[in-house]
Amino acid sequence: MTVPKEMPEKWARAQAPPSWSRKKPSWGTEEERRARANDREYNEKFQYASNCIKTSKYNILTFLPVNLFEQFQEVANTYFLFLLILQLIPQISSLSWFTTIVPLVLVLTITAVKDATDDYFRHKSDNQVNNRQSQVLINGILQQEQWMNVCVGDIIKLENNQFVAADLLLLSSSEPHGLCYIETAELDGETNMKVRQAIPVTSELGDISKLAKFDGEVICEPPNNKLDKFSGTLYWKENKFPLSNQNMLLRGCVLRNTEWCFGLVIFAGPDTKLMQNSGRTKFKRTSIDRLMNTLVLWIFGFLVCMGVILAIGNAIWEHEVGMRFQVYLPWDEAVDSAFFSGFLSFWSYIIILNTVVPISLYVSVEVIRLGHSYFINWDKKMFCMKKRTPAEARTTTLNEELGQVEYIFSDKTGTLTQNIMVFNKCSINGHSYGDVFDVLGHKAELGERPEPVDFSFNPLADKKFLFWDPSLLEAVKIGDPHTHEFFRLLSLCHTVMSEEKNEGELYYKAQSPDEGALVTAARNFGFVFRSRTPKTITVHEMGTAITYQLLAILDFNNIRKRMSVIVRNPEGKIRLYCKGADTILLDRLHHSTQELLNTTMDHLNEYAGEGLRTLVLAYKDLDEEYYEEWAERRLQASLAQDSREDRLASIYEEVENNMMLLGATAIEDKLQQGVPETIALLTLANIKIWVLTGDKQETAVNIGYSCKMLTDDMTEVFIVTGHTVLEVREELRKAREKMMDSSRSVGNGFTYQDKLSSSKLTSVLEAVAGEYALVINGHSLAHALEADMELEFLETACACKAVICCRVTPLQKAQVVELVKKYKKAVTLAIGDGANDVSMIKTAHIGVGISGQEGIQAVLASDYSFSQFKFLQRLLLVHGRWSYLRMCKFLCYFFYKNFAFTMVHFWFGFFCGFSAQTVYDQYFITLYNIVYTSLPVLAMGVFDQDVPEQRSMEYPKLYEPGQLNLLFNKREFFICIAQGIYTSVLMFFIPYGVFADATRDDGTQLADYQSFAVTVATSLVIVVSVQIGLDTGYWTAINHFFIWGSLAVYFAILFAMHSNGLFDMFPNQFRFVGNAQNTLAQPTVWLTIVLTTVVCIMPVVAFRFLRLNLKPDLSDTVRYTQLVRKKQKAQHRCMRRVGRTGSRRSGYAFSHQEGFGELIMSGKNMRLSSLALSSFTTRSSSSWIESLRRKKSDSASSPSGGADKPLKG
């Protein structure tokens, strides 16, 4: 923040220096933000951005110019505009102008309508957000205003569960001391509630009349994208007060468990930190589009070459032969030489031969993409019945790109997980609870479990809580002391707040979902946390109210990884209760607990193996004298001016030792349904999945194991946590060394010390033996993304099977995606559900938003949306793969049929004096791509499939051809062109050879221009129809109708154009009456057509037959397998759920926030509001994933890792 030097210590508004009246910040770099409360006139001088957001690209005025500019970025559109201009020049126009202008206008119009429709829905979504209502204090009265009309300096009233409309300075709230609780999942992905507090001088401004008189001015930092930092000063009543991030409510947050609060708007609209992290809407193009632009340029070069050849031929012919015809065929007056005749002939042939890339290609592409989008929208298997939400293709231009994805970047919270924590299992005094066994002693699966435990004995039980093991409740009821102490610890050692609005209706306000789950479990098992004061905690233990004196809270932080409370019970006994990470607490236990420790560690291994989040519970008795002495030293440490945190940590370490082990808890962070199966399937499809989350490392790693991204079968999991550039570089170097040493050990024959180029190093790393994973923290990632280290990070990460980035900001998410796009040249997909994911969604080639959540920002920015992560496998492996396959087959066929059609003119030029005479009449040229051959190829492009959808999911390796660009690339393009040229040669020379000596039935000469044209045109239509029949892999009634219908339409139009009726109406246009009927009545003509068709098609049939038998690809094998299966009985395969076992690792994860204990002890948050507890659902099985993993590892050439694979830090 910049504060003018001349500002006095006692600030007064009248003394504001002239420099304050700055011009609009957007004219230059804004150095500081100034906002005065309740003074719109003053704030308007700075012309700050309004609170209106915009994700749309056009408006009414800009739509036409901007959209046309975008469309003419397509090389083909510019090419056709150029041809149209040429056709308007009479001297060189060999075809009517309407043959180009009609299709060009048609394709521009269709694309414009599609873009306008897409943008209309963006406008509609923007309006839904901008028109949300907010209560704004205007002229001393609270008025309902739309979000878009909120201005900087306005005072807004927020109520519970409302989204924050702009970046606000919290002034006051319904909670004591100006506290309020917010959920920031839309910003940083964390679901645990956070606390914000108004500064004391404004916390009492809860009355409208007081707020109306508030005229303080805030001077603070300019708009930026730093979510966790804010610095500013409030000047009011001749005093100044420092402001920090703890005083701010950011747009995208939700007010929770707070009845109301008031805030002063500091940043609005695009200046908010949320929008600063969102990035710009980019015009996305597919790799096929980019390739098409290149190919169109090549074709244009080929076209110029043909034009030059024919122009030179024209000049030579005119000079050598044409001079003889001058007597009765004189040149036009403007043509005075053979050279100039050749020059005009060049442009005429450019017009004639332009059909090698017809404009109808682009119309057809848009129609096909639209059809694919509708298939996605109509897919019932991607419809979520629970949320009544269908899948939606929000753009129609990226469908085939879905079949080429190599990297998926996924958010965690709300995307992979449900944000629901469930108390799943526990270990108490060496006994594990939570599993249910049948009469034979086998562990019961989820669907085989009996009714959940009945908690009806407890009137205060949470009815949503489910637990399946009745033996734990029996242990509580019989008064087992260890079990009672276990739940007593859970009911005392926490920072949860409680409220009871009605008798028996108890609500918990949990600062983290983990704590909410643990305290709720204790509540249902008879240890009900009822209330607290700054110095006491009241618990109902099996119906008896007991009040404990709260002596101290040893608060949680990410370094300690534990929290403790010290309480005195009614008998005067002092006891410390502690819960924390097993890696931390197990070293602080008394040696007498060793036997119990070994058993508990076995249980912890089991829980961690199931992907559960674990905590260890312990206690310690303290004598009065020791506690008093310790409390005095703690007080002195808390008052220290320097190294306060270090001194307190040392004091805490001292007391948290030699504790007695009670047991462990296992909480399930519930995954979205089908997440493990989806990740397994996508991994088998050679898609790498990176998780980018704002959550902490332990939580992210635990979810990695839960969803099977990380497994104990991995050779090693590298964890990068360096705080400096050197530390991060060293950790990345060691990771690469280990991977390369592993490859060397299996005979790759190189060492890390070998000097390798960057490209060679990358290829070596990607071929490493074994499976590795990389976990990197946000502060380390900031260094890894620096220009001089980003390649090292990328090489290391891409050599790993899984990558998890923790504590990352929205901007870092986008930077990671951009890094992969920049260097890997791979198709990327980003998927998320919150506003913190918008930036990476916009940056990736394809953005997917999870809909049905509270926030809609991710959906608004996305290209595709659906309600559950599991639908991603169907979007990619079915719709994406089919879209890519269909588009590739369509393009190959389209180029083939148009080269076969156009190149006939080239060969004809050598027999017509290079006069730019066409073989076909202009009506056939116009209708060939629009009527005669358009619908069959459209049907193939929309409906074709190589294997059914079930096989696409069953054989994910079918997805790999799209990733490798195997189905349409430069090689395939040249093959299609060669086939088209081959067909054109036969199409011209076989009829030419036959017609040279053929006669009609009456003995007259068969050869005339019109008969030859009809024969060639008919042969062409039949040959390309047979060819598309060969190319079609999935026949529908529509395919049959379009192919046979197109042939029928061709003959109908052909006979009509040569009929007496049209001649009578248009004698100058349709002069060749009866020519088609007479020509096609000749057996010689039909024999010629059949011969041409056979000679054109048989080599294709022979080649495909040989390839199918000698070198079939996977889709051929799958189709063959499918035929075999139809002849055999389908065998039912029973899949047994297999739990993950392996080496020891910590299952600890606890999403708690530091500083809450101090807040409780201060008594500032003792007045409570309600909390709606999360609903608990049963856990879904992910049994079959292990089989998929095993299947892949069996097929891999690298040997499996050893038994002990440590989690590397």
Swiss-Prot record:
Catalytic residues (positions): D411 (4-aspartylphosphate intermediate)
Predominant location: membrane
Biased composition (Basic and acidic residues): 1-12
Region feature (Disordered): 1-36, 1181-1209
EC numbers, comma separated: 7.6.2.1
Feature: compositional bias, Low complexity: 1195-1209
Top-rank taxon, per record: Eukaryota
Reactions this protein catalyses: ATP + H2O + phospholipidSide 1 = ADP + phosphate + phospholipidSide 2; a 1,2-diacyl-sn-glycero-3-phosphocholine(out) + ATP + H2O = a 1,2-diacyl-sn-glycero-3-phosphocholine(in) + ADP + phosphate + H(+)
Alphabetized SUPFAM superfamilies for the sequence: Calcium ATPase, transduction domain A, Calcium ATPase, transmembrane domain M, HAD-like, Metal cation-transporting ATPase, ATP-binding domain N
Residues recorded as bearing Phosphoserine in the entry: S1175
Topology Exoplasmic loop: residue spans: 87-92, 318-346, 911-922, 995-1008, 1059-1078
Binding site for ATP: D411, K412, T413, E515, F556, K579, R613, T693, G694, D695, R807, K813, N836, D837
PROSITE patterns according to UniProt: ATPASE_E1_E2
Keywords for this protein: ATP-binding, Cell membrane, Endoplasmic reticulum, Lipid transport, Magnesium, Membrane, Metal-binding, Nucleotide-binding, Phosphoprotein, Translocase, Transmembrane, Transmembrane helix, Transport
InterPro entries found in the cross-reference section: ATPase_P-typ_cyto_dom_N, ATPase_P-typ_P_site, ATPase_P-typ_TM_dom_sf, ATPase_P-typ_transduc_dom_A_sf, HAD-like_sf, HAD_sf, P-type_ATPase_IV, P-type_ATPase_N
Membrane-spanning ranges: 65-86, 93-112, 296-317, 347-368, 890-910, 923-942, 973-994, 1009-1031, 1038-1058, 1079-1103
Cofactor(s) it depends on: Mg(2+)
Alphabetical GO biological process terms: Golgi organization; monoatomic ion transmembrane transport; phospholipid translocation
Binding site for Mg(2+): D411, T413, D833, D837
GO molecular function terms listed in the Swiss-Prot or TrEMBL record: ATP binding; ATP hydrolysis activity; ATPase-coupled intramembrane lipid transporter activity; magnesium ion binding; phosphatidylcholine flippase activity; phosphatidylcholine floppase activity
Membrane topology: Multi-pass membrane protein
Record note on quaternary structure: Component of a P4-ATPase flippase complex which consists of a catalytic alpha subunit ATP8B2 and an accessory beta subunit TMEM30A or TMEM30B.
Family to which this protein belongs: Belongs to the cation transport ATPase (P-type) (TC 3.A.3) family. Type IV subfamily.
Identification of the protein by name: Phospholipid-transporting ATPase ID
Organism ancestry: Eukaryota, Metazoa, Chordata, Craniata, Vertebrata
Encoding gene (name): ATP8B2
